[in-house]
Amino acid sequence: MPEINTEEVLGNVSVYPVAASTTIYKGEIACINSSGYLVAGSKTTGLKAVGIAQETVTAVSAGDASCEVKRGTFLLTNLSTDEVDLADVGSDCYIHNSNTVCATETETPSHSVAGVVQNIIGGKVAVKFN
C-alpha cells in the first residue's frame, strides 16, 4: 500500500458558520444545530455542543458570519433546581441555557448533552467539550 500524507488538524479551536438571524456571545456554549450551523446553547433537543464561543458574532443569513469556538474544560453555572454534583463526575451533563448546565435531561423539551463533568469547583461545573 502506498504512503498517504494524512494531515493533522492542530489545536483546540475551530471556526463554524453561524445560523441565520443568530447572535452568539463570547463565553456562551456553542452548538451545531440540525442544519449544521452554529447556535448558542439552549434547552433544545438535538444540539451538538462543540465548545465555548471565543467572540461575539451576529449572522443575518445562514453562514454569512463565522465564530471561533474553543474545545477544552470550562467552568459553567450549575442549575440550582437540577444540580450537577460530585457523583456526576465522568457523566454527561446537559444544556439548560447558553451558560448553565444541569444534571438531567428530563424536562420538555429534553436537554441536549453539554459535555462530560470533570469536577465541581466553587459551585460551578467543570465541563469538558471534546
Where are these regions (language model features)?
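Surface-exposed, low-hydrophobicity beta-strand/loop segments enriched in small/polar/acidic residues
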Residues: 1-130
